[in-house]
């Protein structure tokens, strides 16, 4: 049990480091996109993403635009990692028990409902009402990047709370995408039926003890194809696949230790007989067998998650930011399209902290759950502000919510402004709060 807890702790630490540093890189890519989109290279930037990429066969073209490859295919890999994180947290982490999960989950619910309601109230009875999902999202990479820069000014318990809240927020965002943002062409039930059959197959091979990740990835690609053509956004297939990835390793730790000890004994016995630096056949076989067992003892879920983390953090998400954050503000952008601008900014900057603080406060007063030790209400409010950094996740929802370029551009500018305000104000608030608390401790 202790070894398992250590592995989960290491996974969480690795996750925080990767997400935090990638947040800085994401910011650089977003700024670069804005600079290029407002430079003489603006047309090249826009046209590049619309270039088709694929292959031709029998008179037909099979592929997508570069923009769609990033938003539909690469982002599915990102959502696969998100799904793995959610499953890990549900089974072993801070979402694994009611007492541990209740406080951050209720905070995440408040941080989604209040921003969504604010946006909807401002835009109801307008064509832009369906953008309510935009301010509901949180960009965990940016939020953790900011909280990392604050260092010791923020207690570790608050970092864990923010990570857990963001994971729960991701789960909520996935539900919102699946339910409220289907394809405008409607649902295709034949593809949905095949997708359901593939999900049953994935669940079945998991229960049968199949641990080879290649099998799951292969079936997952077919699942992605069916969901993509069904009318539901393809990233949902990636999340469903993540929940089917096995947790148990092929061999247990005790068996692995016995095998390794046997290999070491063989290696040592043959080493005494060796007359030169070359390994003999039995020693080479022992090394090969030990190598195979190293893979077998690894948890498939954690192994895949660790493999995807750097890919998502330093390639996929920066690419997404660079491809989607470039809005030409020199053009005639109609900032008065309904109340998109106001809805997104108020939702993220005001709605997020208000929703998180109010629902967690009620949660504690009703004795459903309590705050983590060492975390004050001022900390919760500060974390709520940082949760208002929607950025990439909000932009992803914006792409689904708006087909009209004008509405999409306004929402993206609003997301960038709101995320900047939330990050700056949240950071200053937590710094000032730390200084006030430090002075109070000195006086006492």
UniProtKB/Swiss-Prot annotation:
Coiled coil: none annotated. Pfam families: Na_H_antiport_1. Its main location: membrane. GO terms for biological process: regulation of pH. One of its GO terms (molecular function) is sodium:proton antiporter activity. The chain crosses the membrane at residues 21-41, 64-84, 102-122, 131-151, 160-180, 185-205, 212-232, 307-327, 342-362, 377-397, 413-433. It catalyses: Na(+)(in) + 2 H(+)(out) = Na(+)(out) + 2 H(+)(in). It is found in: Cell inner membrane. It comes from the Bacteria. One of its GO terms (cellular component) is plasma membrane. Keywords: Antiport, Cell inner membrane, Cell membrane, Ion transport, Membrane, Sodium, Sodium transport, Transmembrane, Transmembrane helix, Transport. It is a multi-pass membrane protein. InterPro entries: Na/H_antiporter_dom_sf (IPR023171), NhaA (IPR004670). HAMAP family: NhaA. Belongs to the NhaA Na(+)/H(+) (TC 2.A.33) antiporter family. Na(+)/H(+) antiporter that extrudes sodium in exchange for external protons. This is Na(+)/H(+) antiporter NhaA 2.
């Amino acid at each position: 049990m202790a070894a398992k807890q250590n592995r989960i702790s290491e996974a969480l630490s690795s996750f925080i480091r990767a997400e935090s540093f990638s947040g800085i890189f994401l910011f650089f890519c977003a700024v670069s996109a804005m600079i290029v989109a407002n430079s003489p290279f603006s047309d090249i930037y826009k046209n590049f993403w619309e270039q088709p990429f694929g292959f031709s066969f029998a008179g037909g073209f099979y592929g997508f635009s570069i923009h769609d490859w990033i938003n539909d295919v690469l982002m599915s890999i990102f959502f696969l990692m998100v799904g793995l994180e959610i499953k890990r947290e549900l089974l072993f982490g801070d979402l694994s028990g009611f007492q541990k999960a209740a406080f951050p989950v209720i905070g995440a619910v408040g941080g989604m409902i209040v921003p969504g309601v604010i946006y909807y109230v401002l835009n109801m009875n307008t064509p832009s009402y369906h953008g309510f999902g935009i301010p509901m999202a949180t960009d965990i990479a940016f939020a953790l990047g900011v909280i990392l820069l604050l260092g010791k000014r923020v207690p570790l318990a608050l970092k864990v709370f923010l990570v857990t809240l963001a994971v729960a927020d991701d789960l909520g965002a996935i539900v919102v995408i699946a339910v409220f943002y289907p394809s405008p062409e409607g649902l295709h039930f034949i593809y949905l039926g095949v997708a359901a059959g593939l999900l049953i197959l994935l669940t079945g091979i998991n229960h049968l003890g199949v641990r080879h990740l290649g099998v799951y990835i292969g079936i997952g690609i077919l699942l992605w194809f069916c969901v993509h053509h069904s009318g539901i956004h393809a990233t949902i297939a990636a999340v469903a696949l993540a929940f089917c990835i096995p947790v148990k390793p092929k061999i247990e730790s005790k068996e692995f230790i016995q095998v390794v000890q046997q290999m070491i004994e063989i290696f040592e016995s043959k080493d005494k007989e060796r007359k030169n630096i070359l390994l003999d056949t039995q020693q080479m076989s022992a090394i090969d067998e030990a190598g195979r067992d190293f893979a077998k003892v690894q948890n498939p879920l954690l192994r895949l998650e660790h493999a995807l983390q750097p890919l998502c953090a330093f390639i996929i998400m920066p690419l997404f930011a660079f491809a989607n954050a470039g809005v030409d503000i020199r053009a005639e952008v109609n900032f008065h399209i309904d109340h998109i601008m106001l809805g997104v900014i108020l939702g993220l900057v005001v709605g997020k902290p208000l929703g998180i603080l109010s629902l967690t406060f009620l949660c504690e007063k009703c004795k459903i759950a309590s705050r983590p030790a060492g975390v004050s209400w001022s900390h919760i409010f500060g974390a709520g502000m940082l949760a208002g950094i929607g950025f990439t996740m909000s932009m992803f929802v914006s792409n689904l919510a708006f087909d009209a370029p004008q509405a999409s551009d306004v929402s993206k500018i609003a997301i960038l402004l709101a995320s900047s305000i939330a990050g700056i104000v949240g950071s200053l608030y937590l710094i000032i709060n730390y200084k006030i608390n430090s002075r109070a401790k000195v006086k006492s």
